[in-house]
């Protein structure tokens, strides 16, 4: 749920450990 929506990954994903995702969809 982190590659579909850049905000969705913050809500329901174990990747919330690091806010900067490995994919360039989330520049923050």
From Swiss-Prot:
Gene Ontology molecular function: any one: nutrient reservoir activity
One cellular-component annotation, GO: cytoplasm
Biased composition (Low complexity): 9-20
Region Disordered: start-end pairs: 1-28
Keyword terms: Seed storage protein, Storage protein
The protein's name: Omega-gliadin
Source organism of this protein record: Triticum monococcum (Einkorn wheat)
Organism classification: Eukaryota, Viridiplantae, Streptophyta, Embryophyta, Tracheophyta
């Amino acid at each position: 749920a982190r590659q579909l929506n850049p905000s969705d990954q913050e809500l329901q994903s174990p990747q919330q450990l690091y806010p900067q995702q490995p994919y360039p969809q989330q520049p923050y």
